[in-house]
């Protein structure tokens, strides 16, 4: 029992240390350089971009395709495809497909597919498929298929299939199947199956 509590505290601490770096400031993302070509409507009060191709991008809203060699920052909502060599970041909701060499971040909800080399982070709900080399974090609910090389963390509920090399952690409840190399943790309720080598 003491080992289980220590493991939960250690994993919670590790996950807690990584989340604030992405979610400290929810008001507005910092305006940065924009080295890209954009196609947008001339008289659009919302500043929507429909096609974005370049090196570094910092735009207000994307409804369409954004492909950048280094990074892509969308201040508001992203609907469509956001692909970057290093990081794809959306200030609010991301709906569609996000691909980042290192990380994908959605400040609000992520709906669709997130693929990254290291980390996927959704500040609210993650609905769909998340696959990363290191871990996946959903601030509230993770719903769908979540595969992380090290761990998957849902702040509230994990629903669907979670597969991690080390641990799957749900802050409240887990519904579905969780397969963890070392452990699976759900603080309150479990509906489904958990498979691990050490702790469930």
Cite the ranges covered by each PLM segment.
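Surface-exposed, glycine- and small/polar-enriched segments that build interaction surfaces at terminal
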Residues: 24-200
């Amino acid at each position: 029992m003491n080992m289980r509590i220590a493991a939960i505290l250690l994993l919670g601490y590790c996950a807690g240390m990584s989340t604030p770096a992405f979610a400290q400031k929810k008001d507005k993302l910092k305006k940065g350089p924009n080295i890209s070509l954009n196609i947008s409507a001339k008289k659009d009060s919302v500043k929507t971009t429909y096609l974005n191709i370049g090196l570094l991008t910092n735009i207000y809203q994307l409804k369409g395709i954004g492909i950048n060699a280094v990074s892509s920052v969308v201040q508001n909502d992203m609907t469509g495809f956001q692909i970057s060599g290093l990081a794809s970041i959306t200030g609010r909701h991301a709906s569609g497909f996000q691909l980042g060499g290192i990380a994908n971040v959605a400040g609000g909800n992520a709906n669709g597919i997130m693929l990254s080399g290291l980390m996927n982070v959704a500040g609210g709900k993650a609905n769909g498929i998340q696959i990363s080399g290191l871990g996946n974090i959903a601030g509230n609910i993770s719903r769908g298929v979540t595969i992380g090389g090290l761990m998957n963390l849902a702040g509230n509920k994990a629903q669907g299939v979670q597969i991690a090399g080390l641990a799957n952690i749900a802050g409240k409840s887990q519904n579905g199947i969780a397969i963890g190399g070392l452990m699976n943790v759900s603080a309150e309720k479990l509906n489904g199956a958990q498979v691990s080598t050490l702790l469930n």
